[in-house]
Amino acid sequence: MDIIDYHSHLPWSRGSNTFDASALLRDMDDNSIALRMVSALKAATVSEGNTTVLNLAGRHPDRILASAVIDPRQPDVVAYLTALLSEGIFRAIELDPMEFNFFPSEMDALDEVFDLCGQYGVVVNVFTGWGSRTMPAQWTDLVDRHPTTDLVYLHMGGPDFGYGCVDLIQPSNRIYAETSGLYELPVLRRAFASLPPERFLFGSGYPTKISACSIEVFDSLELTAAQRQALFRDNAAALLKL
């Protein structure tokens, strides 16, 4: 099966301030990943990282899906996001409360950010799973206020909030669970037993996670062929209208 990897980052060297797109593409080849959503969470600046991802997606439109990292603390965030989305390349944005040290409830620009994503048909990916700033429940009010915007919980609540994340996704048809970095089989078993199969998106977490391990963990769950097809390909294709 040709996999769609919903979550990865572009490798970056702080010492040389360079990105390693070749390593990312080789990893895709090694793991039968046909399409990969990529963001540049680590970069000298947010703008430089996003521009690099934009250019990478332009060079490899059949392999790379672009996700823009957004820092909602910045005073020009709405204008900046408007300019990015008007390029027509970015399929998603990534909001990381741990990386940028914020609580969603304190960021008054987020309503406009969600509005813009809804207007452009762009998905909002949010980092969850490690510490109080990354609680999945902090995003539910924004989802309720913006009924045209889809939300993805990256790492599916992680080690801190995995069980609670399942409960938050259950009543909504606009919240999805992305799987990278979550290897706790009891949480995964509960999630697959409780949630509709179309709510799951496979993510590798590359390069901080090993792509093969992110794929092989699902061998332990004894998923049906239809569940695997949905997880590894069909759900991302439907969400992103590929």
List PLM regions with ranges:
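Alpha-helical scaffold segments that flank or form the walls of functional sites
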Residues: 18-39, 51-59, 82-86
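Acidic-and-aromatic substrate-binding clefts and catalytic sites of carbohydrate-active enzymes
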Residues: 12-19, 40-48, 70-77, 100-107, ...
